[in-house]
Amino acid sequence: MTDPSLLLAAILLPALGAFLLPLIAMVSKSARNVSAAALVFGAFCANVALIPTALWSGEVVETTLVGLRLVADGLAVFVAATSSLISLIIIIYSFDYIDHYEHQNEYYLMVTMFLGSMMGLVYSSNLILLFAFWELTGVASWRLIGYFRKDTDVKRANKAFLITVGGALVMLIGFVMLWNTTRTFDLAEIKTQLGGTPVDDWVFVLILIGILSKSATLPVHTWLPDAGVAPSPVTSLLHAAVLVKIGVYVFARLFIAGFAYSEFGHTLVLVLAAASALVSAGAALVETDIKRIIAYSTVSQIAFIFLGLASGTPVGVTGAILYILMHGLAKGGLFLCAGIVEHQTHTKDITQMGGLWRKMPVTALSFLLCSLSVMGIPPFGGFFSKAMVIMGGAESGHPWVTGTFVLGAVFTVLYLLRIYNKVFLGEPAGKGGSHEGSRTMVGSVAALTVLSVVAGVAINWPGRLAEIAVNQMMGIIK
């Protein structure tokens, strides 16, 4: 039997420990940095320790926080372990990237608290607790996006905050409407009260607005490309590992594992996901800012996850859950590579780069391998998960949706090849980086790349974990 205190440790170590970091910095900045990594590593270890029970044995681990239920099941543990692993690598990358900037205490506090809030959200089995942690991630991301304090940066941080918090308040109205029907905010009790009856369409739409705003999906996606003004570790954290995955996780938690929804809701999600995939991929094809291109790519790839979830088929949902891991590893690597390139060339304009593979061979190779996974090229993990998602879309009886996402996949190949050609191949067009990034930064990128490759080559292991999580979904709220 797994100790339920592991659940609390995964949440409270980073969420509360984060506030000790400025105090530790008074003694030593290096100690602060290592302590931040240790807090995230502790959360990761707690999540991994829950895997045998929640995934292999199929048991649910429960405890309470402020009297409200926390639940660790296959879905929650899979997402929590993925998020904490990638966050740990991002923290280590930050050691050198952030070293010469101001406000470092706030940076480490917010990043660490951000992860703790994510862990709390993932393990919440009560809508009020989920909402509280949802808002904490919004506050942390707001501070991190505006980290450099420039007027433009602050405006873009405010934009992200207003869109995501506004969406959250709309979602809260949906939660209250659910309470009005069931007289409870506990997910298990709501499911019992509904008894398989689909939630009201208005309730579904209100909750969906909040989900889409957090996951930067059309038509509330514009804040994510603008968030590229943040430090690269932050954009990697927001775009790959944690923030944008919150929305798809909550969708899976509420509408795959929890409550039924109508055919109208099903069609609405498919239409919005298809539009989001194509529009954002088209924007990525013409954009010249490397971080904005990768951000638009994230908007497009999140749409693939929504396709898999909305398909409602076992293969599609499994592919969607698996792609949370595969996209997180590969896209995290791409953003950190972009950070090294920007750090060394002092520009984000890909038309001012070129030929950087000669001076940054490890970064160039890492960018290529991570790109191949996002493109969905075999034997990388992105291939298997995307193939399952598209198969799920085909099985759902919407051939136009499948065709749209196949076209989106083609666009993905085109814009990622365009970046690689402009940045790393050919002759220098302007800014030429003099050398690779620091060992810590390059090592972090290499770690994500290796994990991305291994996850594809050894697909049976992560694929089996995702499959177990999906098989448990319809019975996880007890």
Predicted regions and their residues:
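Short, aromatic-rich membrane-interface segments at the entry and exit
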Residues: S30-A36, I128-A132, H266-T267, R464-L465
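Hydrophobic alpha-helical membrane-insertion segments
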Residues: A37-A49, G167-F175, C370, A447-W461
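Cytoplasmic/organellar membrane-interface segments at the starts of transmembrane helices
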Residues: W357-T363, A409, V413-K478
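Transmembrane helix-loop-helix hairpins at membrane boundaries of multipass inner-membrane proteins
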Residues: M1-A9, A15-L109, R183-Q193, E467-I476
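Short phosphate-coordinating micro-motif centered on Lys-Gly-acidic
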Residues: E135
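Alpha-helical transmembrane segments and their helix-start/interface "positive-inside/aromatic belt" motifs
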Residues: K29-V40, K155-V165, M360-A364, S438-A447
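Hydrophobic transmembrane alpha-helices and their helix-loop junctions in integral membrane proteins
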Residues: I89-N105, M113-L130, A140-V423
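Juxtamembrane helix-capping/reentrant segments at transmembrane boundaries
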Residues: V66-G67, V234, E436-G437
